[in-house]
UniProtKB/Swiss-Prot annotation:
This is Immunoglobulin-like domain-containing receptor 1. Residues 21-159 form the Ig-like V-type domain. Residues 21-164 are extracellular. The gene is ildr1. Homooligomer. Interacts with MARVELD2 and OCLN; the interaction is required to recruit MARVELD2 to tricellular contacts.
Length: 545
């Protein structure tokens, strides 16, 4: 039999155990952004009737901010002591607000501070915040009250962390990106100030530095800079592309996308003075003064060795002989002709030595009359010179009384040496002088120790004097030709004139008259005219320009 006291204790335990209240939450901590929506889950279990249950959501601010104060020394010390520094503080140290309340099946009622907010309770006790604000950052407590349930855990907490600082940062970055995007789109759509190569989403077909628009713009800039060099009449930017004065006819890119409906007159070109080029002016003046009516004589074609090369052909043998040449005939040269060729040379000379100048005709006839007398004296003088040279065996100086004065019938020449040694072997009529080969010197320049011997009548001196009288070219020496050489040559020629026949005048024949041979070539006998293969245009017969 159970005592009555035991039965009382059992009945009290059963009654108290069956009416216990239990509140649960799904997440104890949530993170959200500003202006976002969030749902805080909360549920409860009770034996009371649903109309007797009241649900209340309260807000309490953080004691210490879990974001900004997380790395502080006090926050880390509380964590080391297994405390919650964000929530372990009295209510008088933080802000406490009632968010919303609901009893039974009635409509929820917002708190005083949340009257204008979009906040509600759904299901049993879920809190729904449609738009999270800056001050929603804190701890939310879900409390349930049921009549008759006095035991159990009537409330639970949920931490809501609002990332307001990150939102502000994102807003700032978004604004900068917006300005950057606007700037990119603006500069991409305006080719005159394009400075970037990034594709713009606002106008992908027209932007990203269009090369065609840039080419048109650059071409227009070049055309504006070239305005002074265009025609005197103003051109128009919107003219017809087939027009002669159109500025777009040179670039095909300018033929497209022309939005100008009317012609825009461009400024008139500026006048510039022509550049001062004295060389071009001089050449134009010379060309204008050129006498085109003056006939030009082409050089006659000779075959083989009988061709007389000109000065130009001697300087450049390639491609000059076929050029039309203007021949300036120089005065004939009187040479010492040996007795073996006396008759043929004298007759040929009388036929070919025509008066090249009317003023010098009398002088030429007088010179021809003296030629026969000088030939005999010249032969005797050659024999005596050869005997004296054999006797002296070194071209020593002969006594003055043993020397026979030499007659020089040729006019004095100003220049000493010729261009080449071939002129000493060939007379101006194309025949080779066999006796001049024996008298040819082995070197061009006279050595200082043999200077007196050359003046006294040695064979070398005679051959050099022959070349001196045949050439009008300057001396071919290693040193430069100066006035001292000219003075020495004049003295030498003056000494020869004292021992020769008296000339009618001191100067050689005048060169002021030029005979232009147009269409006539000098007649020569094929048998008598012959020239060596080494003959060049350096002879004294003609000068070709």
């Amino acid at each position: 039999m159970i005592p009555p006291r035991a039965l009382l204790l059992i009945s009290v335990w059963m009654v108290s155990g069956g009416r216990t209240l239990l509140v649960t939450v799904q997440d104890t901590q949530r993170y959200t952004m500003l202006f976002s929506s969030i749902i805080l889950k909360c549920d409860y279990s009770t034996s009371a009737q649903i109309q007797d249950v009241a649900v209340t959501w309260r807000f309490k601010s953080f004691c210490k901010d879990p974001i900004f104060d997380y790395y502080s020394a006090a926050y880390q010390a509380s964590l080391s002591l297994n405390q919650d520094p964000a929530n372990d503080c009295n209510d008088n140290q933080r802000e406490v607000r009632i968010v919303i309340q609901k009893r039974g099946q009635n409509e929820p009622v917002l708190g005083v501070d949340y009257r204008q907010r979009k906040i509600t309770i759904q299901n049993k006790a879920d809190l729904v915040i449609s738009e999270v604000m800056w001050w929603d950052h804190g701890v939310y407590f879900c409390s349930v009250e049921a009549q008759g349930d006095t035991s159990g855990d009537p409330d639970k907490e949920v931490k809501l962390v609002v990332l307001h600082w990150l939102t502000v940062l994102f807003i700032i970055l978004g604004a900068l990106f917006l300005f950057l995007l606007i700037g990119i789109c603006w500069c991409q759509c305006c080719p005159h100030c394009c400075c970037c190569y990034v594709r713009c989403p606002c106008c992908p077909t027209r932007c990203c530095c269009p090369e065609e628009a840039l080419a048109r713009h650059n071409y227009m800039k070049q055309m504006e800079s070239m305005t002074p060099w265009m025609l005197d009449r103003p051109y128009y930017a919107g003219a017809d592309r087939n027009s002669q004065h159109s500025s777009y006819q040179l670039n095909p890119l300018l033929q497209r996308d022309l939005s100008l409906q009317s012609s825009l007159p461009m400024p008139a070109p500026m006048s510039f003075s022509p550049p001062n080029n004295k060389v071009l002016d001089f050449l134009e003046t010379e060309i204008k003064n050129l006498n085109t009516a003056q006939p030009l004589m082409s050089a006659p074609h000779y075959g083989g060795a009988s061709h007389h090369p000109s000065m130009l052909s001697s300087l450049s043998e390639v491609g000059v002989r076929e050029v039309d040449r203007r021949v300036i005939q120089l005065p004939p040269l009187v040479e010492h002709i040996v007795s073996s060729h006396r008759s043929s040379n004298s007759s040929h000379q009388r036929r070919n030595m025509g008066s090249w100048d009317p003023l010098d005709g009398e002088r030429d006839r007088r010179r021809n009359r003296q030629l026969d007398d000088s030939l005999s004296n010249e032969t005797n003088w050659r024999a005596q010179e050869r005997q004296h040279s054999d006797r002296s065996s070194g071209h020593r100086r002969d006594p003055p009384n043993n020397r026979r004065p030499r007659r020089d019938v040729s006019p004095p020449r100003r220049y000493g040496d010729s261009y080449s040694d071939e002129s000493a072997n060939n007379d101006p009529r194309g025949r080779s002088n066999p006796h001049s080969d024996r008298a040819r010197p082995t070197e061009r320049r006279r050595s200082p120790e043999r200077g007196d011997q050359g003046r006294r009548g040695s064979p070398d001196r005679y051959s050099r004097s022959q070349r001196h009288r045949r050439s009008y070219s300057p001396p071919h020496r290693r040193d430069s030709w100066s006035s001292e050489d000219e003075t020495r040559n004049n003295q030498r020629g003056r000494g020869r004139r004292e021992r020769s026949y008296e000339w009618p005048e001191e100067k050689p024949p005048s060169y002021k008259s030029l005979e232009i041979c147009a269409g006539k070539a000098p007649t020569q006998r094929p048998g008598a005219v012959r020239q060596s293969d080494r003959a060049s245009s350096r002879s004294g017969r003609s000068m070709v320009i």
